[in-house]
Amino acid sequence: MQDTFSSPEHFTVLLREAVGGLALKENGIYIDGTFGRGGHSRFILSQLSKKGQLIAIDRDPQAIQVAQNIQDSRFRIVHDSFSAIPDICEKLGLTGKIDGILLDLGVSSPQLDNAERGFSFMKDGPLDMRMDTTQGLSATEWLRLVSEQDLAWVLKTFGEERFAKRIAQAIVGYNKSAVQSGAEPLNRTLQLAELIAQSVPFKDKYKHPATRSFQAIRIFINSELDELEKVLNGALNVLAPQGRLSIISFHSLEDRMVKHFIRKQSKGDDLPKGLPLREEQIQHNQKLKPVGKAIMPTEQEMAANVRSRSAVLRIAERI
């Protein structure tokens, strides 16, 4: 059953678990770093008093349009990437005062379902893939410029694609031939998906052959892992003591980064062995503590929303 805080076009993944992980204070100040279609934001607002505040951020212009329909004095929407959270907080005088940050790192259903955005290999549309369509190179433009070696690296690094070299050779070769013959280079999603499928010698019956390549290109185009690294490091200065991080990731690269970051910050900086330090001195060096174990969607949620099946939620608290 769809949650009442989700929109008709988008199921909000791990809604109650992610918001619950923030341990909301009714007068607290919170950040939803990935507004999307507002499921998490609306739920947070429903739990806050009149003195509470919520700052929502998204770099998708369509998400900003949705957010502008929320008429609530406690709510502020910012068109930016979540990596800008430290700068946004500094401008608002909120550095060190944030009680919780929620990040839902997935591509939203409206983004996937809108063929014009170019995220999906299941629908034909222009090969774009930008979260913010007002900035940067589209996938079409980048694929026209990239070398075979660099493309193979992207596919291998961000998609963990075992046939990265074959696929890169096919894509770059196609575009070179198109330029030489005066034809159009790759510029449609199904066109790229079919070319990738033809390049892969073995098919996985459970996964489309273009899945990993589309993921890799999208991650690179949007600098997704760089953005995540920036916000993780910046969150330490933004959060108030006992402030919470609640982060939902959707693939192993993101989850690995979040997991390792929390683990590193919960241990503190490396100290030379043999130093005569008391336990409280060692703990003073720690910046975060994990809250519980990783949380996955229930069978019921996965049945209602198949796209939630790869979601992993991790929660940490500022010390």
Curated annotation (Swiss-Prot):
It is an enzyme of class 2 (transferase). GO terms for biological process: rRNA base methylation. InterPro entries: RsmH (IPR002903), SAM-dep_MeTrfase_MraW_recog (IPR023397), SAM-dependent_MTases_sf (IPR029063). One of its GO terms (cellular component) is cytoplasm. It comes from the Bacteria. It is found in: Cytoplasm. HAMAP family: 16SrRNA_methyltr_H (MF_01007). This is Ribosomal RNA small subunit methyltransferase H.
